[in-house]
């Protein structure tokens, strides 16, 4: 996975440079849609077929997205370059890195909140507000439910993890008692 990230980084940075001259949100939508299409096994199968030309693969990818930017010459060039260089499998990683660049520019970050129980609106808003104060940036939350946590939450922002779950506390106590 690290190799994909390394290979995808220049593509994401170049694309972000193009997006800065226009509408970053629109480019973000386009890249996310292209990444979703590129994840489909059928698309990868067609792309690797010798019976289908590279131009046809590019047209297929662009036809599968709804973004109005799909008709943009730079978007067409990106897709054609990825197809020509057999790099379609990079699109999901390019999308991830593009979002990271976008978040860094906005002073924001994606946060994964794993909770033992569903978080309701006000409860989630309070948690996100306190996390924004702690991490000193705007957070975009994604919530997952994991009953094995027993209680509490595990928060992941980038490479930082804050685990206040009951399961983590029990594991900590077990380590302390057996040491």
UniProtKB/Swiss-Prot annotation:
Belongs to the ATPase delta chain family. Keywords: ATP synthesis, Cell inner membrane, Cell membrane, CF(1), Hydrogen ion transport, Ion transport, Membrane, Transport. It is a peripheral membrane protein. This is ATP synthase subunit delta. It is found in: Cell inner membrane. F(1)F(0) ATP synthase produces ATP from ADP in the presence of a proton or sodium gradient. F-type ATPases consist of two structural domains, F(1) containing the extramembraneous catalytic core and F(0) containing the membrane proton channel, linked together by a central stalk and a peripheral stalk. During catalysis, ATP synthesis in the catalytic domain of F(1) is coupled via a rotary mechanism of the central stalk subunits to proton translocation. This protein is part of the stalk that links CF(0) to CF(1). It either transmits conformational changes from CF(0) to CF(1) or is implicated in proton conduction. It comes from the Bacteria. SUPFAM superfamilies: N-terminal domain of the delta subunit of the F1F0-ATP synthase. GO terms for molecular function: proton-transporting ATP synthase activity, rotational mechanism. InterPro entries: ATP_synth_OSCP/delta_N_sf (IPR026015), ATPase_OSCP/dsu (IPR000711). Its main location: membrane.
